Structures are given as C-alpha cells and as structure tokens.
Amino acid sequence: MDEIKLKALAKINLGLDVVRRREDGYHEVRMVMQTIHLYDQLLIQKSETPGIQIHSNLSFLPVNENNLVYKAGKLLMDEFDIHTGVSVELNKRIPVAAGMAGESTDAAAMLYGMNQLFGLKLKRKDLMERGVQIGADVPYCIMRGTALAEGIGEKLSSLPPMVKCPVLIAKPAVSVSTKFVYQNLKLNEQTPHPDIDALITDIRNSDLDNICADMGNVLETVTIPNYPVIAQIKEQMLKSGAKASMMSGSGPTVFGLFGDEETARRARAEMKASGLAKQVYLTSIYNNRR
C-alpha cells in the first residue's frame, strides 16, 4: 500500500459543562460529544522526500510542527523508526478554530492512516493512547460516535447512538479564543449548568425532543455577551424551525438540530440569506465507530 484516502469527521457537543477549575489551570469538564457527516479529506502517500510534507487548500494553515497532522505523523515515525517520507494532501471543509475539533480529527485520521499505510498493527485503544499526547480531543476523534468525555476531555465512555437527524452548521466571521472563554468563565451559584445526566438518559431513550430540551453549553455564558452574533444565529435557526440550537465547544460555530430534511434545507437557505454566518453547511448525525 502506497497511499490511503481518509475522511476526518467533525464533532459537535450536545452538552458541555465545566465542573471545576483545577489548581494546574486546566478545567474539568463533562461533555456529550457527537460525530457529524461534515468532514475534511486527507490523502496520505509514501514519498521519496524525507520527512512529512503537508499541502492544504487553505494557504494560512501551518504545514510544519505547529500542525497537529504533522505532530501525529512525527510521533509514529519516531516511535517506529520510519524513514520513508510521507506526503499529505489536506482538503479542509470543517470550519477552522470553530469548536468542531477540525485539527484534532485531522490528526486522528493521520494516526489511523499511518497505522494502515505502514502496517503498524496498532489497535484502536493504542491509537487513542497516542492521540492524547497530541491533543485532548484526538482520542475521541479516533473513536467517533456518541460519547461522554470527562476529566480534561480525555476520559471517554461510549454512549448509545444519537437519534439521526439533520444538523445545520453556521460559523460567523468572528474568531473566539478558547483561552479567553475559559479564563472568563465564572463558576458560581448563578452559573446555569446543563444537566448532562438527563441528556444521557434522553440519548439512551432515543428521545429527540427531550435531547433538544436538555442540551446546554455553559461556555455560552462567556461567548454570547462578548459575541452577540452567536445569539443571533441561534435565534435565526430557531425561527427557521430548529428543534434546538446551541454553540459547539468554545465556539463560535452554532448548530441546529431539525426534525426533517425539508425544514433543514429551508433553514439553510434562510441562514445564508441572513448574512449572519460566513460558512453554512447542512449535514447529519454520524454514528459509526472506527
């Protein structure tokens, strides 16, 4: 095998709660993660040129050790003493720096692809153990599906598959710093926390209406006052018939869950016409695990 082509799927958070701020500065979280059908594509090829060469359709992306794809490749090359060069064609569709684990899922695909390409015979759990060295979301992106993430996001528990439904994605032009969001998060009695356990029960019961009612993201308490366009996009989605709308991760991307394809398609057109979002995609829930 000289090349492998892979899809790197995005994630959304159906629920995101921050439990506490640790003494080391990290935050302990409880998140319900969900893979969706929106994806980047990676073509990974063996190359006569030594090292790792990355080419992307987005000129502003780093193509050196500052890219998690590069880090993932180098980690396996160093561990298994691989001297053959690797070339990566990275076609980005997932919004960048958007709370959808775009870079983490690309790194996960790189680990998976290198494992196949060089016959390393690493099992999924082996890849996940290596993934956590690259980034907290990488192990989940290797696993995929519906999962509860705890700790700093690295402790993963599989959940039953989420109900399939259309998902509308809208990313505004603003950039949101994850560091800024967590630094400005106030954890006190007034902070509205989502009920993650209730959300998990709803998922187990395949109850889309209750899932939508119990969804919540505590980080919106920081982002919405600072970036009003996030609330405007949520409002637009609900006005267009979404059963629920919420920010994913630390934002600024907003997603909406819909009961039927026709309403979702109409909502996509209305979102594009509103001018609130720079990138708009209609996709769906993805439940297959690796």
Q: Each predicted region: which residue ranges?
A:
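Conserved, helical-rich catalytic subdomain that frames metal- and/or nucleotide-binding sites
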Residues: 143, 148-244, 259-262, 268-272, ...
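Short beta-strand scaffold segments in enzyme catalytic cores
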Residues: 16, 40-44, 137-141, 147-148, ...
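Short, well-structured alpha-helical segments that form the helix of a local strand-helix-strand
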Residues: 123-133, 215, 265-269
